[in-house]
Amino acid sequence: MSNSPLVNYTRISPNKNSPRNHKIDTITIHCVVGQCSVETLGNIFAPTSRQASSNYGIGFDGKIGMYVEEKDRSWCSSSASNDNRAITIEVASDTKHPYAVNEKAFAALLDMVTDICKRNGIKRLVWSTNKKDRMNHLNGCNMTVHRDYANKACPGDYLYNRHGEIAAEVNRRLGASAEKPAENKPATGEVIHTVKAGETLSKIAQKYGTTYQKIAAYNRIANANLIRVGQKIKIPADTQAAQ
């Protein structure tokens, strides 16, 4: 079992179990709640009194640190079961909701997750907004979040709402076959559109010959700018796709 060649800094934490008892098949992304460096994160995980660690961390500058080797289980997600099968990644973030990460850190995260998947034979990354799917690895889901196992905001709404986008981009890099579009026309005539990377509500509305305001109202979307990749959006039956 190898470690990532993308690592810029290593400081192994004593807070771990060696070896892990499950093969690596899951990715768990966390927010640090602080725009810190990989060195600072290493200092945080160094004391045994901390009782916490992660496999990897990404600093505000996009550098990548390793604190627990991949062969070992980190103490990161409030779940031994999850951490035994997951690679855990802490990402430098703002200290307040929605705990945003900057572009350098996000770009490094995409590189990191892609590398982990390639080396561990994860052929496709699958995200679900359904907690049951995530916790039980149903329907191919292999991405989990800290809030699944504890009363925490982690990974923050910024990263949580981008998990579908992360999966889509990593799968593109992996060359994973695209899922069949989940667009269909039920008996009611209502169309279900699955949001794809790069789409906005305005673009979707234009495709169906309607307005984004109408779609937002129909789906009770309070903020038209907050839609995510993989989200299912209902298109009113009295609209039709532009020719």
Kindly give the residue locations of the regions a language model identified.
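Basic/polar, cationic surfaces and motifs that engage anionic cell-wall
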Residues: 2-11, 16-21, 95-191, 229, ...
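Structural preference for beta-strand elements that scaffold enzyme active sites
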Residues: 26, 86-88, 142-144
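Cell-envelope and extracellular/periplasmic
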Residues: 33, 82-97, 114, 118, ...
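Extracytoplasmic/periplasmic, Sec-exported soluble proteins
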Residues: 19-21, 48, 77, 81, ...
